[in-house]
């Protein structure tokens, strides 16, 4: 099944399922490792995979090099937007996950 043959709703569902599977795996890893290290590993894995994705869109090394700044700008903007949204979302449920209050 290609993404061209499925609806936007199906793509959204698959997207969310992939996200959940990455988070589930990260949570498993965080049981045995520091969450900070797991987060950094996820960032590195995402950057490595996205470098591969960018390379797949270029027909040759010259095209690849021409696309680098555009790709970097795109992924940085996407990450900033996603991080900002998730930080805001997490603020709403902070006390659910933290049973203590830090001194102000």
Name these PLM-found stretches.
Residues 2-104:
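Solvent-exposed interaction surfaces and binding hotspots enriched for charged
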């Amino acid at each position: 099944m290609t993404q061209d043959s499925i609806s936007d709703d199906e793509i959204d569902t698959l997207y969310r399922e992939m996200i959940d599977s990455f988070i589930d795996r990260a949570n498993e890893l965080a049981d045995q490792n520091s969450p900070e290290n797991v987060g950094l590993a996820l960032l590195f894995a995402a950057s490595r995979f996205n470098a591969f994705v960018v390379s797949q869109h270029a027909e040759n090394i010259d095209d690849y090099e021409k696309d680098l700044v555009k790709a970097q700008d795109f992924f940085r903007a996407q990450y900033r937007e996603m991080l900002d949204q998730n930080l805001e979302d997490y603020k709403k449920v902070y006390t659910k996950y933290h049973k203590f209050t830090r001194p102000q």
